[in-house]
Amino acid sequence: MNHAEGMNSHQYYDKHFQITAVKVFPGEFHATNQSRLLVTLLGSCVAVCLSDRISGVAGMNHFLLPEGSLDLGAGTSAARFGVNAMELLITDMQKLGAMRNRLEAKIFGAGNVLDGMTVVKVGERNTNFIRSYLANEQIPILAEDLLGECARKVYFFTATGKVLIKKLKKSGAAIKQEQPYRGRIVDQGEGAKTGDIDLFI
């Protein structure tokens, strides 16, 4: 796939929404200047949807901070990991014509979906990091749906900046993604049962 469509992407045609779609898996990101539907499945991981309305460039990443304490100071390995995940996406968007000072964010995920989680909850750490990062970079958060006990399937329409969130019951597909990028899920929808709540923001 060419650079304009980003790296590590999985493209298909979504018959329901009648649009070219791209699945973004754990540890990946996708930037585009085309009308696309970016799709990901989240448990404790976080997805950041970025848009530059002027240039029409948009993108999404999907990441999980390494295990550790709640200390996310700039010098910690967890903070460096998170910053790198954000900078990879932003750099690709800039190559397509986006301006950093025009970026707007919508953030999702960080659900506490794993059984037997430690005192330091993974979702809380990811939430603290991404809010702090975006504040420091002066990137406004237009919408968010974070924490809670559910998994989420995220549909990001890059042409409009709109995001459809499907709240999911705990499922095998979501739980698998809580293992830090061990293996790939062939079908992100497999085993996921849609809950009662859909959000369109």
UniProtKB/Swiss-Prot annotation:
Q: What Gene3D superfamilies does the database record attribute to this sequence?
A: 3.30.1330.200
Protein's organism: Chromobacterium violaceum (strain ATCC 12472 / DSM 30191 / JCM 1249 / CCUG 213 / NBRC 12614 / NCIMB 9131 / NCTC 9757 / MK)
What the record says about family reads: Belongs to the CheD family.
* Catalysed reaction, written as an equation: L-glutaminyl-[protein] + H2O = L-glutamyl-[protein] + NH4(+)
Gene Ontology MF annotations: protein-glutamine glutaminase activity
Instruction: Please cite one Gene Ontology biological process associated with this protein.
Output: chemotaxis
Which terms are listed as keywords in the entry? Chemotaxis, Hydrolase
InterPro entries attached to this UniProt entry: CheD-like_sf, Chemorcpt_Glu_NH3ase_CheD, Cytotoxic_necrot_fac-like_cat
Protein's name according to its UniProt entry: Probable chemoreceptor glutamine deamidase CheD 2
The enzyme's main class, written as a single word, is hydrolase
Q: SUPFAM superfamilies in the record, alphabetically?
A: CNF1/YfiH-like putative cysteine hydrolases (SSF64438)
Supply the EC number(s): 3.5.1.44
Q: Its encoding gene is what?
A: cheD2
What does it do? Answer: Probably deamidates glutamine residues to glutamate on methyl-accepting chemotaxis receptors (MCPs), playing an important role in chemotaxis.
